[in-house]
């Protein structure tokens, strides 16, 4: 019987386009140094506003990845 162990790391990512773009950029960047990513949980959505317009979308995510044996 095999046991899977996951580790969870917090990540903050930003975009000037959208929240979805911020999530995708964060996942893409994390994938360059973390292997076996199994899921993400976006825990917070924020935006920076200037002159009535959103200038930055920010997401806080929990990234789950499998610990290698």
Place the predicted regions along the sequence by residue:
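Alpha-helical assembly-interface signal, strongest on the long, hydrophobic N-terminal helix that forms
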Residues: 2-3
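Short, well-ordered alpha-helical segments
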Residues: 6-38
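Amphipathic, hydrophobic secondary-structure cores in small proteins
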Residues: 34-52
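Conserved beta-strand segments that form the floor/walls of ligand-binding pockets within enzyme
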Residues: 7-10, 41, 58-62
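A cross-kingdom feature marking charged/low-complexity
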Residues: 46-69
